[in-house]
Amino acid sequence: FKFLKKEMAKNNKKFKFSNQVYDNIFWSVFSGVTIWTFYEAIYWYGIANGIVKTSSFQSSPVQFFLWIICLPLIRGTHFYFIHRLLHVPFLYKHVHVTHHRNVNTGPWSGISMHPVENIIYQSSPLIHIFIPSDPMIFTLHLILVTLNPAFTHSGFEQIKNKKTKLLDSADFHHQLHHRYFDCNYGNMDVPLDVWFGTHHDGSEEATKAMRLRMKGAATK
């Protein structure tokens, strides 16, 4: 159930240390975890100093559950539009290319990004600085943004125990983005790719439609 049969790259100079896994670990820790820690520190510093207002579950249980419902919508919408931004040629060439070298993805590929991309990508939880929520919601939001990509980039469609499927694994929708680049900018929590005509379902027809769309964009 692996999307691509080949293993992660070794002896390939386009990756740091000529090793894709080591490269991904480096960028995930040096860039991803650093930005993650920075945003978390800002949030908790704001609370400790009375700058950031919160709304606890005890005081607003309805609001708490509304946040739970809205998190995938907020994250999905934010991801689609910042991802389109990162495919602007200048940002792609100097920033997003660090992540896109991973055509064959693995768990460490998820937040293996240039620091500028991690600053942009991980910024959706900052909404909680401006709109009060329970700190647990902020923590959950940040976990979704930082740890979920390890799962969706795993490269395996399913996790199985012998013949029994335990759960679905990597996101085929996003796997196609790493293969074709100019499609599937978001996720299916919010079907913006469908609405904006950038959806690819893996079929030959979708590939032809994508190429026609890109050809048309290039001639404008």
Regions found by a protein language model. Name each.
Residues 1, 35-39, 71-82, 142, ...:
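Hydrophobic alpha-helical membrane-embedded segments
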Residues 1-41:
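Early transmembrane hairpin module of multi-pass membrane proteins
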Residues 1-18, 89-220:
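Cytosolic/stromal cytosol-facing helical appendages immediately following the last transmembrane segment
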Residues 24, 60-68, 118, 137-138:
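Residue-level signature of transmembrane alpha-helical entry/exit and packing/kink sites
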Residues 29-44, 70, 121-127:
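Hydrophobic alpha-helical transmembrane segments of multi-pass integral membrane proteins
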Residues 38-74:
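Juxtamembrane helix-loop-helix connectors linking adjacent transmembrane helices
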Residues 39-43, 47, 79-87, 129, ...:
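Membrane-water interface at transmembrane helix exits
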Residues 60-93, 97-100, 109-113:
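Function-critical hydrophobic alpha-helical transmembrane segments in multi-pass membrane proteins
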